[in-house]
Amino acid sequence: MASILEYLPGIPRSYWRDYVKAIEPTKPLVIPAGQRKVQLFPSDLTDKRGIVLQFAMNSNNPGITFYVVIDNRRIFANFTQLNDAGYTGYYIRDMPWLSEYNTTGNIYVVNLNTEIPFNNDVYAYVDNTTTSDAVIGSMGFHAIIFNKGFYKALADLKNGKE
């Protein structure tokens, strides 16, 4: 199955406004040195009707690990690292929620290729295993939640319907 992200650049922006909710921290986060589990987003921000498609983080610190917990199940502890110049296959530059990214550091992406319904909570965590505190800027980490309607709209678009 192809990644859902491969289709995003061709989707009219009205679909994004109607079906996509982007969440981001409002202030920089300081992650203390040592292995910690720091919750980045409170669970009440998640759309219970929806699914989690992607988490992205801009960081050049290899000692920082990001992971997601859905319904108490830890998933995707190993993020895919995209190099700064390429963004190959993900069309990062075409995604409006990443529009303020520059080319410093690395972009880490968790790509969930299939719909993952959830009944309870979704958490994004950070472990900092380095000996220094890490600061994540307020534009650094985004949670993008697509509701079920987005997938119907996407299917219609792929089938030639507007």
Where are these regions (language model features)?
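Beta-strand-centric surfaces of beta-sandwich/beta-rich domains
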Residues: A2-E162
